[in-house]
Amino acid sequence: YVDEKVGLENTLIVLSADHGGPEAPPDMQQYGFESRYVDPESWEREAAFAALKERFGIGKPLIQQFNPPYVYLNRELIAEKGLSQGEVETAVAAELIKFDGVALAVSSTALTSGDLPDTPLLRSVLNNFSPRRSGDVYVVFSPNCFIREFDGSAVAVTHGSPWRYDTFVPVIFAGAGLKPQKIYREIHTVDVAPTLSALVGTKPPSGTRGKILVEVLEGR
């Protein structure tokens, strides 16, 4: 359709990704690297987690689901018991961070309040947090640790990871009039929107946070 109706000479193709593509644990292990799968379904069976539930008087499953990177708690059960949502979130995060394969666990209550240290890791977590849409506890797996099963498949990559191998992605502009070149400075995927706006001569979208990639404009 593009070839026939628009013409490639009038088309700009932009490619990127929403996460990286690291090697799977079996591949890394054969070269001597420490890497493993994590099984979130086992967390609630851990003795420490059982003790936490006993402390709160909870006899039913507390974790409703794990949709990376968020744990979703059974809010109806928490309310039924007359418990503080924030207190339960904080307690769950404190236990999860002790488990193998978990580098960080932060309650949504803490992320909402902003009462957290200003570190690169937590800044990355905050960039992926929305009080209205996010889960109850943000879980960051340790480097080279991946979820064992998601939607029926073992995976080596998923959303929400702040590590370099998962945040390093390509940004490719291809089209008539662009000069072939490679850019080695650090850029961000959010730079694509304002760059496209500059190319077509319009104002960038209201939610734009990126910067114009001047190399793309200079290459035309």
Put a short name on every predicted segment.
Residues 3, 124-125, 173, 209, ...:
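C-terminal non-catalytic regions of proteins with extracellular/luminal or membrane-system context
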Residues 38-86, 156-199, 214-220:
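Substrate-binding rim/cap in mid-to-C-terminal beta-strand-loop elements of soluble/periplasmic
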Residues 103-104, 202-209:
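Short, well-structured beta-strand/strand-turn elements
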Residues 22, 30, 98, 177, ...:
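Short, well-ordered loop/turn and helix-capping segments at boundaries between secondary-structure elements
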